[in-house]
A protein has these predicted regions:
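A short acidic, Gly/Pro-enriched loop at the edge of an enzyme's catalytic core
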Residues: 254-263
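Mid-domain Rossmann-like dinucleotide-binding core that forms the NAD(H)/NADP(H) cofactor-binding site
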Residues: 95, 155-156, 162-250
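C-terminal hydrophobic helical "lid"/dimerization subdomain
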Residues: 1-2, 274, 323-373
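Cysteine-cluster motifs in flexible loop/terminal segments that predominantly coordinate metals
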Residues: 100-156, 160-162
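Glycine-rich beta-strand-centered segment in the early N-terminal region that forms part
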Residues: 32-46, 59-111, 116, 124, ...
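Short N-terminal strand-loop motif that marks the start
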Residues: 1-73, 78, 151, 155-159, ...
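Glycine-rich phosphate-binding loop and adjacent beta-alpha segment
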Residues: 270-337, 372-373
Length: 373
């Protein structure tokens, strides 16, 4: 067991601003030793994603207290079985990307090449445990729940081997961290589901970390136009700076009657999905990656889908197999075609995590990184 420092969400649904209500406290936590199929990782950096905020504001109800953070990278310090050499392709000292849905590799969902989220992995995430059901985080013997098998807003984490993908050392920690959620999710939706043809356009609704990752991934395709849609002018300007060919607010894109064969919704609000559906061209695909509250509903014309041969597809974790797809993103980044670092707005200290949640909720940041090194 070691003592670590971590950002623990104590209660759900605290009023804003979080800088005053302070629902997350940075505290000393006991971290148990890793078990056989687990790793101890020293966290270097962790990104602040809307899926963290959704736990804080109660849109996605999870058990508390929970140590948040699910987009992180760090260095492997120890294996659960005590070995120090290579194990399943990972060595002590390797930099690993932590991914927020472990794939068990054995269930029927795991046989779908990434299209369906792993069943035991999803069950563990919902229960706030590691894959296999364990909880390694405690405070005075009381359990602290894991966030999506990672809990990366901390100096160290114990994760299942299936939650870690090694990357070469030339991939810096801030790039590695973003590969684990924003890039895998937004980029994976483009590579694995949208896969635009030359001459087609890709529209992205919602230009936060996930949507911007979809934008930069779509820009890696030759002869593909990229359209960014967000309600905030600053986000439209940021997407243009990254190379988006056209940008619009939801009202502007509706008024202009624009249609695209591949449309990605990365907001997590029903109005944004309605915008995305209306933007989809005949024969096209609306790919939804946003995570609204479970009670959210949208209004759709079924006839529109049939008469125009359109489809609506949900994509979790970018429909990715992380061990297959993270190297694809690393290769694009190394070729200079995927500017992942451009998604970083600022670095914050662990103690400023409540303020970081306010910035994310206000829409004033793309990706903030919590620096733990
Ligand atoms: N499917 C997955 O595996 C997965 C993984 C990570 C995140 N997510 C979800 O993806 C969504 C985006 O995450 P993020 O971290 O990029 O969030 P974010 O808060 O950084 O970005 C959301 C963006 O949407 C914009 N927006 C809000 N309402 C809008 C509207 N009606 N129309 C157009 N734009 C609007 C905001 O201005 C903001 O720029 C969240 O719901 C998150 O929980 C899903
Ligand atoms: Zn995320
Ligand atoms: Zn599985």
């Amino acid at each position: 067991m070691i003592q670590i420092q971590g950002a623990v969400l104590e209660r759900i649904g605290a009023p804003r601003p979080y800088s005053e209500s302070r629902p997350i406290s940075v505290v000393d936590v006991e971290l148990d030793d890793p078990r056989d199929d687990e790793l101890l990782v020293r966290i270097e950096t962790a990104g602040v994603c809307h899926s963290d905020l959704s736990v804080v504001d109660g849109n996605r109800v999870r058990p508390v207290p929970m140590l948040l953070g699910h987009e992180a990278a760090g260095i492997v310090e120890r294996f659960g079985d005590g070995s120090t050499a290579e194990r399943d392709g990972v060595r002590v000292g390797d930099r690993v990307v932590l991914v927020f849905l472990p794939r068990c590799g054995h269930c029927t969902a795991c046989a779908t090449e990434g299209l369906t989220p792993c069943e035991p992995g999803s069950a563990a995430n919902n229960a706030g445990t590691l894959l296999g059901g364990g909880i390694r985080l405690h405070r005075h013997r009381d359990p602290i729940y894991h966030h999506l098998g990672v809990s990366g807003f901390a100096t160290h984490a114990v994760v299942n081997r299936a939650s870690a993908v090694p990357v070469p050392r030339d991939v810096p920690p801030h790039v590695a961290a973003l590969l684990g959620c924003a890039v895998l999710t937004g980029g994976g939706a483009v590579l694995n589901v949208g896969d635009p043809r030359p001459g087609q356009s890709v529209a992205v609704v919602g230009l936060g970390g996930v949507g911007m990752a979809a934008v930069i991934t779509a820009l890696t395709y030759r002869d593909v136009r990229v359209i960014g849609v967000d309600q905030l002018p600053e986000k439209l300007a940021a997407a243009q700076a990254l190379g988006a060919h056209e940008t619009y607010t939801p009202a502007q894109v509706a008024a202009a009657g624009i249609k695209a064969p591949v449309v990605i919704e990365a907001v997590g609000h029903p109005a944004a999905l309605e915008t995305a559906v209306a933007l989809t061209a005949p024969g096209g695909r609306t790919i939804t990656v946003g995570l609204p509250p479970p009670t959210a509903r949208i209004s759709l014309s079924p006839l529109g889908f049939v008469a125009e041969g359109r489809s609506l597809i949900g994509s979790y974790l970018g429909s990715a197999v992380p061990s297959r797809d993270i190297p694809r993103f690393v290769a694009l980044w190394r070729e200079g075609r995927l500017p992942v670092e451009a998604l970083v707005s600022s670095s914050v200290r662990l103690g400023d995590i409540n303020e970081a949640m306010d910035h994310l909720a206000d829409g004033t940041a793309v990706r903030q990184l919590v620096d733990l090194a």
